[in-house]
Each structure stands twice: as structure tokens, then as C-alpha cells.
Regions:
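Flexible, compositionally biased loop and terminal segments
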Residues: 1-237
Length: 237
């Protein structure tokens, strides 16, 4: 089968990745290695999110997506889930005003129905409304998100015939397809993350556990992306 018209090779490596998604793996292992609680690991991970977001701005990233909480995460222990949800609420309350001042647009991605608490939904809506006019970087935060769930939800509402019509039914239709997906802790799987959007994304696996993933690691991942030749189903010339 020949490639479609959209399967055209980009003949030159891009100077930088503008649209980046990160799977933040390793908070629990990081905490265990240090004799800390899992909650401590998640707190360290949350602090690292803020630091890498600011690095992404400096490095010319226009859209950054960082997995916060998946639909599968509800199956973890009640204690861990409660701690994660509480931390997420605190993060929105504390960080949104500062991120707004820095020109960050916040966009939460995922189902906003039960079991997500109403108070979390209200916080997400507040943060989105406050930062809606910002354009320095868009920070997509998948919460209660699953790639299969997103596709199923879109399919239920779909009455069109084209991919573009289908895309408009995704949780964040304005999101560009990530050019680069980074996963920490050495793992090499998508874990139900942005399944529609990552069809042609480049994948970079880093050995660092997420709390240890620093600016140098981010720069190294971006440099690896810049060395690659993206073919989109075509052949190298």
C-alpha cells in the first residue's frame, strides 16, 4: 500500500521540537531508593514539573504535555489516590497565579466526570479561564486521562467522515500532535498516553527517574530529536 499524500518526508531535521509530551515515570522508585514515602516521591515529581516547564519555555517549546493522572491510576491504593488528588488541588491553587503572570496557558485534558471530585473540576475550570489568553506556552495536563477513553468518547459523538472532523471531538482538539514523546526511568511504552496524537511522534527514553530528570536531560532529549530524520511513512531520500 502506497503512503497517503500526508505521508511526506520532512527532508531536513528540525532545529527544535515545538510540541513535546512527557511521561513522568519513576516517582515511587525515586522515593523508595531514598527511604521516603510514595507521597514524598510524588511531591518531588510535582516540583520537577514546574522546573521543566520553565526550561521548556527557555528552549522554545510551544506546547508541553505532562501526564498527571491516568484513568488507571484510580486502581492504586486509596491512600495514594487521596494524596495525589490533594496534591493536584494544591498545585492548581498555588501555581496557577504565578504561571498566569509568566504567560502560561493551562489546559486540562481528560474526563471530568466521576470519580473526579467536583472541587477538582471547579479548580481546573478556574485555571483554564484565568490563563486562556496567555500564549507564551500552552501546558496541557492530562488528568483522569486515558488514550483509549479519549478515542471512545470521540467515537461515540462522531457523525462525520474525516480525520479532521474526528480530531475536533478529542479532549483538546487544538493540541498539535507531539513531535517528541519523552519517557523517564528507562521504560519504553506509551501507557495509554495520547494514542491518537502520537501516531508519528518520535520517542526518546531516558534512564533518569522523573524527579532526577533535569534541564540537561531535557536538552539531551531535544538534541536527540533534532538528529533524527522524520519520514511520516515515506523513505529517506
Amino acid at each position: 500500500v502506497a503512503p497517503s499524500d500526508s505521508d511526506v518526508e520532512d527532508p531536513t531535521p528540525p532545529a527544535r521540537a515545538r510540541y513535546v509530551a512527557i511521561i513522568t515515570d519513576g516517582n515511587g522508585r525515586w522515593a523508595e531508593q531514598r527511604g521516603l514515602s510514595v507521597t514524598d516521591g510524588h511531591r518531588a515529581g510535582a516540583e520537577n514539573v514546574k522546573a521543566r516547564l520553565r526550561d521548556a519555555v527557555d528552549l522554545g517549546v510551544e506546547e508541553l504535555t505532562i501526564y498527571a493522572f491516568s484513568t488507571e491510576n484510580w486502581s492504586r491504593s486509596l491512600e495514594e489516590v487521596k494524596a495525589l488528588v490533594k496534591m493536584f488541588a494544591e498545585y492548581i491553587d498555588r501555581e496557577t497565579p504565578e504561571l498566569h503572570e509568566e504567560g502560561v496557558r493551562l489546559r486540562f485534558v481528560g474526563r471530568r466526570t466521576s470519580p473526579v471530585p467536583d472541587e477538582i473540576v471547579r479548580r481546573m475550570e478556574w485555571a483554564e479561564q484565568l490563563t486562556a489568553g496567555n500564549d507564551r506556552i500552552t501546558f496541557f495536563i492530562p488528568f483522569n486521562y486515558g488514550g483509549r477513553a479519549e478515542i471512545v468518547d470521540a467515537a461515540r459523538a462522531f457523525t462525520g467522515t474525516t480525520e479532521e472532523e474526528f480530531r475536533k471531538l478529542l479532549y483538546a482538539p487544538e493540541m498539535h500532535d507531539p513531535e517528541l514523546v519523552i519517557r523517564t526511568s528507562g521504560e519504553q511504552r506509551l501507557s495509554n498516553y495520547l494514542l491518537w496524537q502520537t501516531a508519528y511522534s518520535e520517542f526518546v527514553s531516558r534512564e533518569e527517574l522523573w524527579p532526577d530528570f533535569d534541564r540537561a536531560a531535557l536538552e539531551a532529549a531535544l538534541a536527540e530529536f533534532a538528529r533524527r530524520r522524520r519520514r511520516f511513512g515515506g523513505r529517506v531520500a
